[in-house]
Amino acid sequence: MKTKYSHYNNQLQLAHQGKTVFLKGFIFRKRNLGKTLFFDLRDVSGIVQLLVKENNPQYDKIALIKLETVVQIKGQVIERINKNPDLPTGDIEILVSHIEILSEAQTLPLNVFQSQESLEETRLKYRYLDLRNPEVKHFLIQRHHITQSIRQTLLKNDFLELETLILSKSTPEGARDYLVPSRIYPGNFYALPQSPQLFKQLYMIAGFERYFQVARCFRDEDLRSDRQPEFSQIDIETSFLNQDEIMSLTEEIIVDLFANIWKKPLSQPFLRLTYQQAFELYGSDKPDLRNPLKITDFTTFFDTTTCPQNMFSGNIKGFKVSKTAVLTRRKLDEYQLFFSKHFNLKLFSFVKKNDKIIGGISQFIKDDSFLKNEEICFVVSGTKDIMHKALGIFRTKLALDLSLVDTTQEALLWIVDFPLFETTQEDLPQPDLTLENSNTSNRLYSLHHPFTAPCDIAILKSNPQKALAKTYDLVWNGYEVGGGSLRINNPQTQELIFSLLGFSQEEVQTRFGFLVEALKYGTPPHGGLALGLDRLVMLFTKTNNIKDVIAFPKTQSAKDLMLEAPSAVDQEQLNTLKLKFKCNCN
């Protein structure tokens, strides 16, 4: 029988009626109606129905074919009597004249047609079978289309697709490194890159001006539903473009994606909020603007002079909502417990009915004009940063409980003017501290990374804790899908940043000596960003789990169930690397 395809399944239409075709694929479903067999043949393009009549000399053999067996068939395209409008090939079927089994399948550990209903452990262990499900396969096909759209936008803007190293050097970039021991240099280690940050800056110093790549990144950090230990990002760096120009280029990428993937228009420019505005309005630096709730300052409506001492400590802020019917007493108690347990704040709630405020603190409200009948108001008071953070989390919870998020909309915005430093950071690599500088209470940490350019050098020198950074994060429906900054192109400024972060001269030379030296030989103004490819695909495919859009993801505990990795290695391999294994696992 002819061994080449004549068509992919989804290419076949009524226009092919009467033609002989040669197809290959998996037997997806089958139905035996006594004198007629129906099969669904699945290939990468889609599904087509096969018809086998009783007079076919292979009828008895074909009737015994197991699901997921790989076959090639010869047949004639005929018009389907009972058409299926849900299939691209629903107007036709293939009258099979010959079938050849290429690989017979044994009984499968999961139902490919309904693999999404299987346990996640089973799906991940047999991921290659899970990926046969057309809905699951669609995620990765969309990933391809999204990647290609981004690539085409960058290529038309004169970017070069260049690679960077995988075996790199351990540098503090915000998480723990995955280390690779060197056989040739015992006791020394490579690190898998957390990002190509330093390499892409070196590309700019080398004069390439516009770089991008689909980069693999590795971070040994705690996992979440939208995070994996290895992930992909669209990594971009440019010379001579300012912040507005880089943000505009990024918007062009997203606008093209909406047009190519969803066939939807998207207006520019995107909304911009400063980091401070985002926290004051939404209690988050990645707010979901489909949620209509905004933090409101209600202080002026209260008579705080008559309140008990310590009832309010600062401004009184919160939300008001109109969906009071679904808020039970139990739910209100749950909200109060959330604030007291996690933030040591007291939540007050009150409602307006028949033009009268009802609630425990109604006596302290001097002006109730801010509240309409049947509206409920939630307020707290406390330290600004803690209060805003608490209200931000509560905002998300309240919107979920009351179904306030408009899921028919897409909300994109930029967050800009981040602080350059933060003063607390847990579980991250730290510089060595000398005895003279051993007090960690006022330690500074880079909010993004130590190569970010400050907005104002004078403030950086006089009051570094107040310094802002030339950074910009792209937020979509509450997810950070990209972020970047302008970089430092002055060696003195870079050394000042390292000093403020507590790195000694020896540490700087050991970890970043190559960069500091490179900055001395003429460095163009440059900046860039990275778009999280996995998160973009997750949002474009409307799934809530990032594992769905990664071909071979790991579990929440960073295990690969299919490969059974990580795994032990034999003693000979350790001896070759001159390593001795010591574990205090309890």
From Swiss-Prot:
User: Chief location of this protein?
Assistant: cytoplasm
For this protein, what is the EC number? 6.1.1.12
| GO term, biological process aspect, one | aspartyl-tRNA aminoacylation
Residue numbers binding ATP? 219-221, 228, 480, 532-535
Top enzyme class, one word, equals: ligase
Q: Name one GO cellular component term.
A: cytoplasm
Q: Which reaction does it catalyse?
A: tRNA(Asp) + L-aspartate + ATP = L-aspartyl-tRNA(Asp) + AMP + diphosphate
Annotated region (Aspartate), positions in chain: 197-200
The GO terms this record gives for MF are: aspartate-tRNA ligase activity; ATP binding; nucleic acid binding
Keyword annotations: Aminoacyl-tRNA synthetase, ATP-binding, Cytoplasm, Ligase, Nucleotide-binding, Protein biosynthesis
Q: Which residues are L-aspartate-binding?
A: 173, 219, 448, 487
**Subcellular locations according to the entry:** Cytoplasm
SUPFAM superfamilies, per the entry:
Class II aaRS and biotin synthetases, GAD domain-like, Nucleic acid-binding proteins
User: How does it associate, per the subunit comment?
Assistant: Homodimer.
Q: Which family does it belong to?
A: Belongs to the class-II aminoacyl-tRNA synthetase family. Type 1 subfamily.
What this protein is reported to do is described as: Catalyzes the attachment of L-aspartate to tRNA(Asp) in a two-step reaction: L-aspartate is first activated by ATP to form Asp-AMP and then transferred to the acceptor end of tRNA(Asp).
Protein name (Swiss-Prot/TrEMBL)? Aspartate--tRNA ligase
Source organism per entry reads: Onion yellows phytoplasma (strain OY-M)
Q: What is the lineage of its organism?
A: Bacteria, Bacillati, Mycoplasmatota, Mollicutes, Acholeplasmatales
